[in-house]
């Protein structure tokens, strides 16, 4: 049987820390082509990962993380996901996430109308914060959070 005796490993990494580093039976993420589920002996993949959730299952245990955008790679039974932010669903504070969204939207409204390089970059960064906040709320409501 394919994969017999083999194990899939997953690493979920942010610039600050390694969020998850261990065995997995199934890793699910949203990449450029849509949602992907990876099990042992999966074919190699390199892609971007979108603001969504990453679900890591091992046995009866499932861990869910709200993530920002980043990169996704599968090779040799190792899934590597590199993102700016990854928060366990159980640790998400919905009120705090909603506050982050409101604050970022206020900042967007205060940006100058002209589109010079600095304001374009600021608009992109603030828009990313809004998307992350919205994703935190979505994941907390779907998978449990505070």
Curated annotation (Swiss-Prot):
It is a peripheral membrane protein. One of its GO terms (cellular component) is proton-transporting ATP synthase complex. One of its GO terms (molecular function) is ATP binding. Residues 103-124 are annotated as: Disordered. It is found in: Cell membrane. Its main location: membrane. Pfam families: ATP-synt_DE_N. Keywords: ATP synthesis, Cell membrane, CF(1), Hydrogen ion transport, Ion transport, Membrane, Transport. Produces ATP from ADP in the presence of a proton gradient across the membrane. Belongs to the ATPase epsilon chain family. F-type ATPases have 2 components, CF(1) - the catalytic core - and CF(0) - the membrane proton channel. CF(1) has five subunits: alpha(3), beta(3), gamma(1), delta(1), epsilon(1). CF(0) has three main subunits: a, b and c. This is ATP synthase epsilon chain.
């Amino acid at each position: 049987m394919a994969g017999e005796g083999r194990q899939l490993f997953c690493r979920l990494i942010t610039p600050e820390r390694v969020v998850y580093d261990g065995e997995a039976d199934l890793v699910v993420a949203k990449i450029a082509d849509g949602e992907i589920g990876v099990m042992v002996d999966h074919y190699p993949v390199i892609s971007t990962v979108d603001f969504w959730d990453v679900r890591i299952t091992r046995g009866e245990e499932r861990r869910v993380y709200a993530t920002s955008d980043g990169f996704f790679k599968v090779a040799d039974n190792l899934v590597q996901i590199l993102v700016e932010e990854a928060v366990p669903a159980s640790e998400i504070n919905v009120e705090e996430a909603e506050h982050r969204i409101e604050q970022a939207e206020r900042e967007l409204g205060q940006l100058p109308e002209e589109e010079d390089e600095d304001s374009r970059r600021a608009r992109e960064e603030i828009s990313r914060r809004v998307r992350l906040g919205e994703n935190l709320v979505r994941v907390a409501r779907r998978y449990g959070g505070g």
